[in-house]
């Protein structure tokens, strides 16, 4: 499928309504600039054995109060290649996604969309239940929203879980938030981040002040009230932060010493892994 639509803000790529199931199997789809694959509230999306060039794969529902919030039930990407420019998950205020499952797939940011936010998880004020990435390659960049995790100003009382297993991941946040974890000024709930048998590079975003501290994995210590737990097993992880406001020099954060501001040391477990160049072989606390 190759779309040749004349670009217009009023034109969608592929879209189905609320309470719908969208399934793409054994397909090659090329959508032009700003065309995405969308489903309405309470729907689900499955992509299997396909090659997609799209401006996001998501539920797009914006409401004005949390009581009217919409949910994407499940997004599955299996044995597929995705070149994207926007969110994979839930997009829109107060929207959420229950489950994202990525298996045997490659997801990377389209270089044409350098100004956009590519997030696996939730968009602005959006939350998620679980993100499970296995046997995959991820290479994306976002801003304000965590590239893997929750969106800007996410508010929730739920427990969320990110699991990265047997995968290669390189993610960068350009502004104010971590690359894996909780989006800028998010609050409420608990988020557990589990990395096993994987190679991960995560770069935190720019600082609002010289006293700010934004790690590659976790949360912005000065603007996020979400409880964070981190477990790393049999992996190589490089987690970076910017050294100063308006700076460009990345340094290792303090994940390897369990001294991330706002995250108690007892919430961080590392075993059989090399974290920030330091080998840590002891068992979990």
Predicted regions and their residues:
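Surface-exposed loop/turn motifs in large extracellular/passenger domains
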Residues: 1-33, 38-143, 148-176, 180-241, ...
């Amino acid at each position: 499928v190759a779309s040749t639509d004349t670009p217009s803000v009023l034109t969608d790529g592929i879209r189905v309504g609320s309470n719908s199931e969208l399934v793409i199997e054994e397909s090659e789809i090329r959508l032009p600039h700003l065309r995405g694959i969308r489903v309405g509230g309470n729907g689900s999306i499955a992509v299997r054995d396909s090659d997609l060039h799209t401006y996001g794969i998501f539920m797009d529902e914006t409401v004005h109060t949390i009581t009217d919030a919409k949910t994407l039930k499940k997004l599955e990407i299996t044995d597929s290649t995705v070149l994207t420019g926007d969110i994979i998950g839930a997009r829109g205020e107060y929207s959420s996604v229950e489950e994202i499952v990525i298996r045997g797939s490659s997801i990377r940011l389209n270089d044409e969309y350098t100004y956009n936010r590519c997030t696996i998880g939730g968009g602005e004020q959006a939350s998620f239940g679980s993100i499970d990435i296995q046997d995959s390659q991820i290479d994306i960049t976002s801003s304000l929203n965590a590239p893997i995790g929750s969106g800007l100003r996410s508010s929730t009382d739920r427990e969320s879980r990110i699991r990265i297993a047997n995968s290669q991941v390189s993610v960068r946040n350009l502004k104010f938030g971590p690359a894996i974890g909780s989006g800028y000024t998010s609050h409420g709930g608990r988020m557990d981040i589990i990395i096993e048998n994987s190679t991960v590079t995560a770069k935190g975003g720019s600082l609002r002040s010289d006293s700010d501290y934004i790690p590659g994995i976790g949360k912005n210590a000065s603007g996020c009230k979400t409880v964070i737990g981190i477990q790393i097993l049999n992996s190589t992880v490089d987690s970076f932060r910017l050294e100063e406001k308006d700076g460009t020099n990345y340094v290792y954060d303090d994940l390897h010493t369990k001294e991330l501001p706002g995250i108690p040391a007892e919430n961080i477990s590392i075993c059989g892994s090399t974290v920030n160049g330091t080998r840590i072989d002891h068992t979990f606390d």
